[in-house]
Structure formats: C-alpha cells, structure tokens
C-alpha cells in the first residue's frame, strides 16, 4: 500500500534520513518513534505528497486521511466536517476538545489508512482511552507518531524507530520493542568487541611478520 525505495531526505546542514526499503500494508497498526528532530513528521509529509524535496521513490496505492498539526485533511472532505474543524481552529473549543473532535472526524468508517501526528497531545485520560478503543476497533490500519509509550503499547503492533538517519523495524508492541532493542544493542556490542579483538590480532600478526 505504501512503498518506499532508496529515499534520501536532506536539510540544509545535514542528511536527515535515508530509507533503503520500507513497505506498509493497509491493515498495519504502526507507531513511528524517535527523538525530536529526527524527521518523523517530515516522513509523514513525504508519504502524503506534501514534501517533494527528496531523492528516491515513494508510492501510495490507497486513499489516506491524516492529522498533522491539528489540521484534518481527507480525500472527500465534507462541508460539515470542514465547518466543525474550522470552529475548533477559531477557538470555540478547548485544545483537548478540538483535537477529540478532529480525531472523531478522522476515524469515520469511510476513511482509509490513517496518518496521525501526536494524537494524544491534548487529550485527557478519558479521551485517550476512548481513542484507544476506537483505534483498536478499526478494520484498517494507521501510522502514528507518538511519545506516549502506554498509548503505543495499547494501539500498535509494529514499531518503526527513526534513529541515526535510518529506520529500524520491530514486529511487536512497545514492550516487545524495548526487549528486542536491548537484544540488538547487546548483539551490536558483541559484534564490535569481536571486531576489535580480530583487528588487534591481525595487527599483532602483521607486526610479528615485519619483525621476521
């Protein structure tokens, strides 16, 4: 449904990220995580066609609806939804109520795959639990950005971590991600330790050969 090949995104002072290959299916429920400034929202904007300043291939074979910076956009945006969204922007609702209203619109059954940026940022606990229930009842998937670990663990079955300009995939919830990440870190540390040992062995061997 969403296919990315050899994607390179740069900003004026550096390469933001490079993604060799990434495929997202329509029923995937994914969290995109990573530290601030790593390019998470930029990646969503590229997928949506809102940012075309990149190298590589991005193909989307399905309708998308999304919420970025509290602004809902969909393929068939009805006058009623637009009117309600404008009311929230005009300040007639609290930030939490405005976001809840927009998320309700976004979660309409007529929409397809969702892309959502920080969906719980202005929600109280009750509103967050309602959102979790709605997301879990959906038959189609979503890709969301969030720093809320509890929310991710309850709604997502796959984690994409944007780190050091690369994407690492974890096929499980947030708890699985934490466990698997620790295993990968230990494996990399062991690999590096073995590399250093082998490097020193070869250096010693070369030194002995020179002496003889």
Regions found by a protein language model. Give the residues of each.
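Flexible nucleotide-interacting loop at or near the entrance of a catalytic core
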Residues: 1-4, 185-212
């Amino acid at each position: 449904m969403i296919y990315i090949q050899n994607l390179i995104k740069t900003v004026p002072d550096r390469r933001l990220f490079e993604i060799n290959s990434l495929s997202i299916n329509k029923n995937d429920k994914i969290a995109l995580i990573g530290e601030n400034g790593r390019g998470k929202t930029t990646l969503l904007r590229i997928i949506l066609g809102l940012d075309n300043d990149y190298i590589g291939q991005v193909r989307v074979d399905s309708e998308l609806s999304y919420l970025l910076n509290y602004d809902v956009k969909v393929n068939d945006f009805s006058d009623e939804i637009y009117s309600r969204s404008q009311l929230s922007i005009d300040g007639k609702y609290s930030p939490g109520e405005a976001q809840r209203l927009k998320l309700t619109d976004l979660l309409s059954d007529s929409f397809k795959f969702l892309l959502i940026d920080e969906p719980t940022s202005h929600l109280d606990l009750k509103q967050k639990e309602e959102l979790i229930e709605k997301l879990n009842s959906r038959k189609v998937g979503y890709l969301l950005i969030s720093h809320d670990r509890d929310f991710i663990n309850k709604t997502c079955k796959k984690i994409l971590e944007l780190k050091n300009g690369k994407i690492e995939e974890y096929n499980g919830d947030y708890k699985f991600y934490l466990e698997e990440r620790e295993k990968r870190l230990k494996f990399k540390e062991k690999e590096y330790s073995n590399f250093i040992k082998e490097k020193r062995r070869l250096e010693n061997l070369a030194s002995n050969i020179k002496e003889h």
